[in-house]
């Protein structure tokens, strides 16, 4: 299957090459020429690993031995065989995506990406090492480091915004072991780090480097495709619980930053899964809510630091893929992305906005409401959730109030509450004194919810990666590795 850039349909590569390169040469994102035919009902009959194998084989057919790759990625690494279990909380179904090795939803994709990338490297006869460049707003960095550490033929460099991640998230990254890993803080915010990574790709295009650059961010289709599985898993769980009949549509509320997680839901729908409305939940950085409401994407606003840092983003890269999927017009997408880069704003045509709003609905949740939601859900329903999940919960409530759409609702829970203990303790009336590690212990004592072992084991570990650089120094830093 051929993939081409969202900005130019002429230069096509096969799916293995798209995974290997990560970003298209013109700065666009790789997308398949067509969405393949898919037996979605057969996909629902298997295990989570069976589902992943079927979906990835359909979307990335040029990568062989997919079943073995899936088994290597997931077996024994998650808390349950389902990988992403669901739990009924009040009137919603919560899809718990934090049961992997780093307690964040990105484990699903970043356990799989190293298998896809190293196989794609072999398929393409590449002898050079691959250098993975990743910008993180918190969770991607650790999940990528966990997936790629000590993988032969691959090096990884993670950039994170200095002071822009939680103490626990920072500790997860800077204590990372492995002979092929580098972690560095960037003075600036996540958008600065992400833009810096894209500029490194552009600056190195066509140059003879001792390594090939690739990405572990969701700009890489190999990062995005594995996330489709858990939408099928959630639907299957609803079937098994008797909450729906086969063919019934289900709504999904998705905490959204870079637009990758929610786009995976749309890809699931394109593969045939009966997905109803996809609810895009933002925090106070509500550029996506404004866009879905008005059709104007305007990043010309201050980036606010919130209690949900993985959504502290003003440039949602994967939205470009949606614009392409719904318009099919690479020239339009290229023009819009140029406007965003030069002017900081663009407006989509009315018919494209109508197509977006037919599939997506947007709402946002500031820190105050996230705190209220976490406290209320715990007090009334006994469920402990993090600030990102609270945004998804609040958006789901908003959607039902505004639309009176009472189809079954799945709220994606994207991170363990123990990654954000001060916010969660504040919400449920706990003492927030001491370090985040003290807070985790106090939170567990209050609620009886165990601390994930990967987080409780961080305290006292040695900081191995303490560098801090200016955003303009990122290229020089990478070339020096």
Label each region the model flagged.
Residues 1-481:
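PLP-dependent amino-acid enzyme catalytic core
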């Amino acid at each position: 299957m051929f993939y081409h850039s969202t900005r130019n349909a002429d230069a096509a590569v096969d799916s293995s090459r798209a995974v290997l390169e990560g970003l298209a040469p013109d700065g666009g994102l790789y997308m398949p020429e067509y969405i393949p035919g898919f037996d979605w009902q057969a996909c629902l009959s298997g295990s989570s690993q069976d589902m992943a194998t079927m979906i990835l084989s359909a979307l990335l057919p040029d990568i062989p031995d997919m079943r073995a790759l899936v088994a290597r990625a997931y077996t024994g690494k998650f808390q349950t065989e389902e990988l992403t279990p669901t739990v009924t909380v009040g009137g919603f179904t919560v899809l718990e995506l934090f049961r992997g090795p780093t307690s964040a939803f990105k484990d699903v994709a970043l356990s799989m990406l190293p298998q896809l990338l190293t196989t794609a490297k072999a398929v393409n006869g590449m002898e050079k090492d691959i250098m993975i460049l990743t910008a993180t707003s918190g969770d991607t960095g650790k999940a990528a480091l966990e997936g790629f550490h000590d993988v032969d033929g691959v090096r990884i460099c993670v950039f994170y915004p200095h002071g822009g991640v939680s103490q626990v998230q920072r500790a997860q990254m800077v204590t990372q072991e492995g002979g092929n890993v580098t972690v560095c803080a960037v003075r600036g915010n996540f958008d600065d780090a992400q833009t810096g990574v894209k500029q490194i790709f552009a600056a190195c295009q066509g140059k003879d480097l001792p390594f090939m650059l690739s990405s572990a961010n969701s700009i890489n289709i190999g990062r995005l495709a594995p996330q489709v599985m858990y939408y099928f898993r959630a639907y299957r769980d609803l079937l098994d619980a008797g909450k729906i009949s086969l063919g019934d549509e289900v709504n999904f509320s998705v905490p959204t930053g870079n637009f990758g997680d929610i786009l995976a839901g749309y890809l699931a729908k394109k593969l045939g899964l009966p997905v109803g409305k996809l609810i895009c939940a933002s925090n106070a950085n509500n550029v996506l809510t404004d866009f879905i409401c008005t059709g104007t994407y305007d990043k010309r606003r201050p980036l606010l630091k919130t209690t949900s840092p993985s959504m502290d983003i003003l440039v949602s890269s994967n939205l470009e893929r949606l614009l392409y999927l719904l318009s099919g017009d690479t020239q339009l997408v290229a023009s819009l992305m140029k406007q965003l880069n030069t002017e900081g704003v663009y407006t989509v045509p009315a018919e494209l906005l109508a197509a977006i709003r037919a599939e997506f609905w947007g709402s946002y949740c500031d820190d105050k409401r996230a705190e209220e939601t976490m406290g209320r859900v715990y007090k009334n329903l006994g469920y402990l959730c993090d600030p990102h999940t609270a945004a998804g919960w609040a958006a789901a409530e908003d959607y039902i109030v505004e639309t009176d759409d009472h189809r079954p609702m799945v709220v994606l829970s994207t991170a363990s509450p123990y990654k954000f203990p001060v916010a969660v303790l504040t919400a449920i009336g706990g003492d927030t004194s001491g370090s985040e590690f003290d807070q985790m212990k106090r939170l567990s004592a209050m609620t009886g919810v165990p601390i994930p072992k990967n987080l409780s084991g961080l305290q006292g570990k040695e900081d191995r990666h303490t560098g801090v650089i200016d955003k303009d120094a990122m290229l020089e830093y990478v070339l020096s590795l």
